[in-house]
């Protein structure tokens, strides 16, 4: 932890689907928080000097062979500890209590009753609704602990050893279904851990600028600038830190949205006075993608070719030591960690060659998407960039399903431009987290101008979300959808049908490929 962060809450990851929510909630309070593997040693944690430690939930039983554990010496560090669900069970197991399989598993909402006035429940109602998700439970709390809350199926729903600042809850306060979950976490963060809540994006900028300067020194940094939110924020942040030591390369791979290439050069080269080199690599990418229809293969080809183009261009430059990337927290999570399966290979995470000549700088890799937008606003980046639609590294290459052609790319490009224009016309940009068009590899029969047609179908995908980890399909008004559909079939050649995707994530991902 950098010395510019004077307080931090450390969350140890035991594999719960809600882990990232804990970190997010705490940051929303104005307190810096990081999620780290459960394998951190007590000595490593001591060096990080957190104000508090949270043991997350997880799918294991403390008695399972190979179940996730932590260094039990963390209970000797004189640092407040909060165990959530599996974290409470692990605390109980280490400190001499007893955990058993529940006779009745408990998933969903439950009513709990608070005993006395424990610190975690200060100023909260005696009876409240919480979210349970457990198969084991604490049947005997460790010596010296008090039982702070009970429920019908979980007699020890919360426990504490106040003199040591050890707390455990069997439910999930980080989930919004827990009625006073945020208040409970605030009581731990501010009441127990004595944090002051002064962390902000302004602090983050100062912290990251110091880290960038300390890391880079007087050396040169190269940044792949796409014009998307992530790479734009990275470029402006690093430029603010080291000025002309940053060179940006903008690769136009022919897979961009309408008007994007021109917009990138105008905004960053002219508006921010940054050194931006534009590379026209359209033919190179499309030739590599000929005959390829598998989505993972397309992602890998685009990712690898991007690096090869980048290498070719960087070879023309002298003295470049660092490569900056806009990798986010969600990229790392979805690309697979010790406790998470790989969902997709991310362009920023999975496509780097082993012999890459640069060292990486990833200043956004602890931030979620909404935090990156807040950071961009704090840096003075225009709203049309900060609130630009999330755009994958492979670009329109994964919004054309199956094999890519220039004709198909133009269909997606034009239909997407219409969608974005109408969403803006109706003032819905801030209400919908992401929206785009996709071209499935199918044709259908239609009738246009009294003639039979056999043309492409365009799919519209629009979702609401906070960070992209989960999402719901956006309830766009029917009249807006009708206007979009009418314009697409009339203005985009070779399209005779428009459909709307009403699938949430999960089970679907946001992108179709």
UniProtKB/Swiss-Prot annotation:
The lineage of its organism: Bacteria, Bacillati, Bacillota, Bacilli, Bacillales. This is GMP synthase [glutamine-hydrolyzing]. Catalyzes the synthesis of GMP from XMP. Pfam families: GATase, GMP_synt_C, NAD_synthase. Pathway: Purine metabolism; GMP biosynthesis; GMP from XMP (L-Gln route): step 1/1. ATP binds at residues 226-232. Residues 199-388 form the GMPS ATP-PPase domain. Gene3D superfamilies: 3.30.300.10, 3.40.50.880, HUPs. Residues 8-198 form the Glutamine amidotransferase type-1 domain. The active site is at residues 85, 172, 174. GO terms for cellular component: cytosol. Coiled coil: none annotated. GO terms for molecular function: ATP binding; GMP synthase activity. It catalyses: XMP + L-glutamine + ATP + H2O = GMP + L-glutamate + AMP + diphosphate + 2 H(+). The gene is guaA. Homodimer. Keywords: ATP-binding, Glutamine amidotransferase, GMP biosynthesis, Ligase, Nucleotide-binding, Purine biosynthesis. Its EC number is 6.3.5.2.
């Amino acid at each position: 932890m950098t010395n510019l962060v004077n307080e931090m809450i450390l969350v140890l990851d035991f594999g719960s689907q809600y882990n990232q929510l804990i970190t997010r909630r705490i940051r929303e309070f104005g307190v810096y928080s990081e999620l780290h593997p459960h394998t951190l040693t007590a000595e490593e944690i001591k060096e990080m000097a957190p104000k508090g430690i949270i043991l997350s939930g997880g799918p294991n039983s403390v008695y399972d062979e190979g179940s996730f554990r932590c260094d039990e010496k963390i209970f000797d560090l004189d640092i407040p500890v909060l165990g959530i669900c599996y974290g409470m069970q692990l605390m109980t197991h280490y400190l001499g209590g007893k955990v058993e399989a529940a006779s009745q598993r408990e998933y969903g909402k439950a009513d709990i009753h608070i005993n006395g006035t424990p610190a975690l429940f200060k100023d909260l109602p005696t009876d409240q609704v919480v979210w349970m998700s457990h198969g084991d439970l604490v049947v005997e709390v460790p010596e010296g602990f008090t039982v702070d809350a009970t429920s019908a199926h979980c007699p020890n729903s919360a426990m504490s050893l106040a003199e040591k600042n050890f707390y455990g809850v069997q439910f999930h306060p980080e989930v919004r279904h827990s009625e006073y979950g945020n208040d409970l976490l605030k009581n731990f963060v501010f009441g127990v851990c004595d944090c002051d809540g002064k962390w902000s994006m302004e602090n983050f900028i100062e912290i990251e600028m110091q880290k960038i300067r300390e890391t880079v020194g007087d050396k040169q940094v190269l940044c792949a600038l796409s014009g998307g939110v992530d790479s734009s924020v990275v470029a402006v942040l690093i430029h603010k830190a080291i000025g002309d030591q940053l060179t940006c390369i903008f690769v136009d791979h022919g897979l961009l949205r309408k008007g994007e290439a021109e917009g990138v050069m105008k905004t960053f080269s002219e508006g921010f006075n940054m050194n931006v080199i534009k590379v026209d690599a359209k033919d190179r990418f499309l030739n590599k993608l000929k005959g390829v229809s598998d989505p993972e293969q397309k992602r890998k080809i685009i990712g690898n070719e991007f690096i090869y183009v980048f290498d070719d261009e960087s070879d023309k430059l002298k003295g470049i030591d660092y490569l900056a990337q806009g990798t986010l927290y969600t990229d790392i999570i979805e690309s697979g960690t010790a406790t998470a399966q790989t969902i997709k290979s991310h362009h920023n995470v999975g496509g780097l060659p082993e012999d890459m000549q640069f060292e990486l700088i990833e200043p956004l890799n602890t931030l979620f998407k909404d935090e990156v937008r807040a950071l961009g606003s704090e840096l003075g980046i225009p709203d049309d960039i900060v609130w630009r639609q999330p755009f994958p590294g492979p670009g329109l290459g994964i919004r054309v399903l199956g094999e890519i052609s220039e004709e198909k790319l133009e269909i997606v490009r034009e239909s997407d431009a219409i969608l974005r224009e109408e969403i803006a016309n109706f003032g819905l940009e801030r209400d919908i987290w992401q929206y785009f068009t996709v071209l499935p590899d199918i044709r259908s029969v239609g009738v246009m101008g009294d003639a039979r047609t056999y043309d492409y179908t365009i799919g519209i995908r629009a979702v609401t979300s906070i960070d992209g980890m989960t999402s719901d399909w956006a309830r766009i008004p029917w009249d807006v959808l009708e206007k979009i559909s009418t314009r697409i079939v009339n203005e985009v050649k070779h399209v005779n049908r428009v459909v709307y995707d009403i699938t949430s994530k999960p089970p679907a991902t946001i992108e179709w490929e």
